Amino acid sequence: DIILGNPPDIPEVTMVHLPRVEATLAPLALLTKTVWLPWIKLEKPDARLIRLSEKNNNWTFNLASDDNKDANAKPSAWSFRLDNILFDQGRIAIDDKVSKADLEIFVDPLGKPLPFSEVTGSKGKADKEKVGDYVFGLKAQGRYNGEPLTGTGKIGGMLALRGEGTPFPVQADFRSGNTRVAFDGVVNDPMKMGGVDLRLKFSGDSLGDLYELTGVLLPDTPPFETDGRLVAKIDTEKSSVFDYRGFNGRIGDSDIHGSLVYTTGKPRPKLEGDVESRQLRLADLGPLIGVDSGKGAEKSKRSEQKKGEKSVQPAGKVLPYDRFETDKWDVMDADVRFKGRRIEHGSSLPISDLSTHIILKNADLRLQPLKFGMAGGSIAANIHLEGDKKPMQGRADIQARRLKLKELMPDVELMQKTLGEMNGDAELRGSGNSVAALLGNSNGNLKLLMNDGLVSRNLMEIVGLNVGNYIVGAIFGDDEVRVNCAAANLDIANGVARPQVFA
């Protein structure tokens, strides 16, 4: 038996256990001052990797001769050469307090090496860098960041790890609950983990579930899947950059495309980029404000229940009661632009092109601006949610321009005879951790203006609650009433609107 022990500050005694080691030596190479081992075979190697903190682990060595090395000393005339490392089955146990990983990985030879191009599907493509074959298969089980994790994968040969200029091939497919992460590609400078270039796929019940696996804070959504290229430059001392390029996928029934860059560092990591949906199903944005999305809603609810969230919409209430998770808003910053080009929605909600600039900094969230088309006109708003306040403080400044009255309620028959346009401005302030709470105690002002309009008399009678006149009009015919100008000024206090001017 060969046993490699741990440093004194590591609680476990053994780092590596080798029951048996076999090697061959090429004796003639000694004549040229070369120690040449054509192969070395390890029988059932067992390694235990432990990290207690960012700077304390059992795989970083400081050799005794390193500090006392003579700068003027001549290099040794002897050299060492190892051509191959073989083993039947290996086991790697990982106990990482930093990433909360407690994993057991079993490594088996594939029997016959698999070419990199065969596994990744890049056969026949020009490849300037030579990538080694896949030599070993992996099976993993355990927990990562406190979440259960299982998976399989493939990696290159052991000797490929030492080549600084040779990319090391990796492939894996992991699952945590209903969340799946699959990738294939290369690791650059694997001994120092200098970076990766991977084709990366995600799928699951909700984007919010990725927080536990990746540390990236994303909103709750309907079921999703994405496929893109991840290029990362890793520097554990300073800052690492993860660039998810040109991804395509879907959220619910909506397609998504874009690129996102996640940068670690102080005081908080940051997510930046652009995301676009060419055909956006408006209901798929529902979970962002606590509204069921329809398709996949049950999976989204299961995702919330798994995280211990209780989401019960009171009977007879329209405004969403789901709470915003403001306690997580300070884990990272964000600067992301989103566009929804073609909007799918019910005929009763005439919304078109949507765009917004999302800025999250130190738990302070701004949608600045939020724009979309509505009823032939446009809505522009600035939304500010102070997630660092308890309860959350919210403010909305909204401008509505050239909304066509006929298109505001296309399903209402009486509105089809209505002509004219509506303009308005609203300023609202409120507090609370849900849409219902924010609007339920909101204060502010609403101004509306209509000019050059034509309105159904019956509609005016209904609005005025004059039911008798409406019945007469319904029996003997309806007239149109021309409206040269109509204006309203409403003050809002504790969620109740009171008209100051209505003319």
Go through each PLM region and give its residues.
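Secondary-structure transition motifs
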Residues: 2-129, 144, 271-331, 453-478
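Residues on the solvent-exposed faces and adjacent turns
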Residues: 6, 25-27, 44, 51, ...
